[in-house]
Amino acid sequence: MNRKCCGPGYATPLDAYKNGPREKLLYVVTVQPNLSESHGDYLSTVDVDPDSATYCQIIHRTFTNRTGDELHHSGWNACSSCFNITGDDATKIPKRDKLILPSLNSNNIYVFDVGTNERKPEIWKVIDGKILLDNNVSSPHSTHCLANGNVMISTMGDRNDNAKGDFILFDSQFECVGTWTKGAEKAKCGYDFWYQPKFNVMVASEWGAPKNFKQGFHPDHLANPDEIGRRLNFYKWNEQTLFQTIDLGDEGMTPLEVRFLHDPTECHGYVGCALYSNLYHFWRKEGSDRFEVEKVVDVPAKKVDGWALPEVTGLMGDIIISLDDKYLYFTSWLQGDVRQYDITDRSKPKLTGQVFLGGVVLSDSNVVVTEDKELKKQPDPVFVKGKRLQGGPQMMQLSLDGKRLYITSSLYSPWDKQFYPDMIKSGGHMVCLDVDTENGGMTLNADFFVDFSNEPYGPTVPHEMRYPGGDCTSDIWLDE
């Protein structure tokens, strides 16, 4: 007799929102910008329990002991998509005990064991980047677990670092299964992805050709539409085929972080287009299998003197949606602010909060704003616990209850070196915003600051964050 067992995660998004525990640890992808430092990138374990004696401290570092990786994003071997398991053998219930960290530059994929000792993760397996090249993919990015036990990772290039959007699959023991996409139709570029089995759909976004973005930001890389992201790609989930591509145009260049709503019965989502800081809403009309898009937020560029370019765009780095699907947040890495929007009306986000955390247009910088459609004066530098915030807000992670928003400062180390050399010298940071979930609004927590300036082998820069039990960007729920 078959029965349903409870796997990892939570039954529903609202179950996680209402009943999930307060986070006590954060796993933070940490990049060593000094490429000659032999310990390389690492996974930081950060204590975020306010009752702990080591609150706001990095309590463990798990080094790759390799150079040239550029760890970037991370994902789990199992999540809430595996919550409902049918069967009699409880030993076969998936466990959320492995954290996967792909490397953008080397193509190596690190699998960390976080189940044996969640405070001291260890590297369990290293998947050699040559395996990806053998499958004609490179620059692995986003990781999601699948309900069948496999793990899927998006890729952005072919074996020669030309633009190519695809996905590579691994089984539960992290043996390569091959690429996911079937048929001759492939996306021009790749980056992030999110799936919704109820609607038989997966959406994927685009950055650009690895051979280009690895060099840093260069405006001439925007000229070839086949080498720069500007499209949303929709796949039939069961058939594993690309069936619709929507070109967002110049305003939609570099659509990066893409999210469906957490509620698996709502076929709505958003994508943050980094270059010109535009937020797009996408949805499928009832009775149709085709998706539509609309631009719902447009952050205006600031005209400036004293900078490398005549305008400073926001550079929308990350977007995140609260588990109750009420609020959407995004960061503007160059303009330096974090924004909160009420998305109860999916087509008309309402700005409900804004906090500045650095950026390139600060009042004491050499950059002079000559035209600003939003602000009357340039924002002042921000200090937390006596330390000036270098760089700008980039990656985010939201607590399950939506009340704490954690933010790191690094985008991608070649770009960090280009836009924020002082952050490379002094190290990055992590801060926290306290969120009003009832009325909207955010305030900087003056007591929370994680400093990456005095690390054992020199200053480092933090990027993506995860909680041990799952979070607002790792878990996908099924309608069961």
Can you describe what each PLM-predicted range is?
Residues 2-6, 15-95, 100-128, 162-163, 183-347, ...:
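Beta-propeller domains
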Residues 2-22, 70-95, 136-148, 194-200, ...:
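Structural signature of eukaryotic scaffold interfaces centered on beta-propeller domains
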Residues 15-21, 28-38, 84-102, 153-163, ...:
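Short, conserved, GDST-rich strand-edge loop motifs in beta-rich repeat architectures
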Residues 45-54, 111-121, 173-174, 234-241, ...:
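Short loop/turn segments immediately following beta-strands, especially the blade-tip
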Residues 57-78, 124-136, 180-188, 242-252, ...:
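Surface-exposed loop and turn segments in beta-propeller and other repeat-based domains
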Residues 114-197:
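Asp-box/WD-like beta-propeller blade repeats and closely related beta-sheet repeat scaffolds
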Residues 266-285, 309-423:
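Loop/turn-rich, solvent-exposed surfaces of beta-rich toroidal or solenoidal domains
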